[in-house]
Design a protein with these regions (language model features):
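Bacterial Sec-dependent N-terminal signal peptides
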Residues: 1-29, 121-123, 305-338
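A short beta-strand motif characteristic of beta-propeller blades
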Residues: 14-19, 56-64, 99-105, 148-155, ...
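Conserved short beta-strand element of beta-propeller blades
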Residues: 20-40, 63-83, 90, 104-125, ...
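Short glycine/acidic-enriched loop and turn motifs that connect beta-strands
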Residues: 44-46, 87-89, 128-132, 180-184, ...
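Beta-propeller blade signature
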Residues: 90, 135-145, 188-203, 238-245, ...
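Conserved blade-ending motifs and adjacent loop-strand segments that build the rim/top face
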Residues: 204-221, 247-270, 301-309
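Solvent-exposed, low-complexity, intrinsically disordered
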Residues: 335-359
């Protein structure tokens, strides 16, 4: 009897996509403002509780699917919005209808920008377009249905970027890594290796640190925030950025890290961690799972943010200069020992001295 109860409780924490649709979702978004999951297929958009209950479904025509396919889903006051990933278009799902509400035009100037909500506004930072990377914020005001540019005071700004890791905690927007454009060859990009923080109330930027340890860090839906740390995977290893001391940490690996579905979200809720895994036997067997020990990620070691190679080069260079200076002074001292000094009553060679009697 006890075994049956345990099995029932276990399967209640799994949500098989076959219950939602015969199609595997093209994308899944976790909407923290509403604590719901949004599944998108070519035929419908489905809303569910994290535990699996379906709370809403919107059938899509071919035209509607094209409108929301390349979009990021957000929510304000339980109303869902779909923000075009390239820039411009905003669609709203309300009262079982999908409608475009923005008064802007479609463009491709903010591809791979960071999209988030703050105080009932939809923000996006950075993005790539027309051989350039943006370093400013735009926001969509749901009152006027217009995109506006965020105006800030003159200050030191991060380089223009796109495809950055990002997250919002309280009044701060954090940006980690990403890519930027080579100013001398705008057909090429290179990875950024820095961490910046923007105060969304004061409108001020703060450069937190630079790092050399990671070759590149870019956006992933597997990134998540939990217990004042930002967690992410890199080369099948779990890491965290600690917000309390602004350091990177290597974490003991999550047991199922190799089975995580890369384009589906990981998120924490009610002290639990939720994640998607796929079966190696059948592609359709994808489930959302609950890990009840969200606070038990152990730190293996703290990551040095700078490459030790540069430090070694500096030390070797310093020692070389000291050696050259010592060698120079030593030669000078030996040379001085060979000089004969003739005085009125003596002849001196180094420490040797010959007295001269005056006749």
């Amino acid at each position: 009897m006890i075994i049956c109860f345990i099995l029932i409780m276990f399967f209640q924490s799994l949500l098989n996509f076959e219950e939602l649709t015969t199609e595997i979702p093209l994308s899944v978004d976790y909407i923290p403002a509403s604590e719901v999951l949004l599944y998108k297929t070519s035929k419908s958009i489905t809303l569910t509780r994290v535990e699996g209950q379906i709370i809403g479904k919107l059938p899509l025509t071919v035209n509607q699917f094209e409108q929301v396919n390349n979009s990021v889903a957000v929510a304000i006051d339980s109303i869902f919005y779909f923000i075009n990933e390239n820039g411009g278009f905003v669609y709203r799902w309300h009262n079982d209808e999908l409608e475009r509400i923005d008064n802007s035009y479609g463009h491709r100037s903010q591809m791979m920008s960071s999209i988030f909500t703050y105080e009932k506004k939809i923000y996006r930072h950075g993005g790539y377009g027309f051989f350039d990377a943006r370093n400013f914020f735009t926001f969509f005001d749901i009152e006027s249905n217009e995109w506006e540019v965020e105006i800030i005071d003159e200050q030191i700004l991060p380089l223009g970027s796109f495809d950055s890791k990002f997250f919002v905690v309280e009044n701060y927007f954090y940006k980690i890594g990403g890519e930027t454009i080579d100013p001398f060859d705008r057909t090429k990009s290179y990875p950024l290796k820095d961490v910046w923080r923007f105060n969304l109330k004061d409108k001020t930027w703060e450069h937190l640190l630079d790092f050399d340890y990671f070759e590149t860090l870019t956006f992933s839906k597997n990134d998540f925030v939990m217990n004042n740390k930002f967690y992410f995977t890199n080369q099948n290893q779990l890491y965290a950025f600690n917000l309390e001391n602004n350091t990177f940490e290597q974490i003991e690996n999550f047991p199922l890290i190799e089975k995580l579905v890369k384009n589906y979200p990981i998120f924490s809720k009610d002290a639990n961690l939720f994640y998607f895994t796929s079966s190696s036997n059948e592609e359709k067997q994808i489930s959302v799972n609950k890990h009840s020990k969200a606070g038990n990620f152990k730190v293996e070691r703290q990551i040095s943010t700078h490459d030790n190679t540069s430090l070694i080069i500096w030390i070797v260079g310093f020692l070389t200069v000291i050696l050259i200076a010592f060698n120079f002074l030593n030669k000078k001292r030996k040379k001085e020992k060979k000089i004969i000094f003739v005085k009125s009553n003596s002849i001196n060679l180094g420490k040797k001295k010959i007295e001269i009697d005056v006749i």
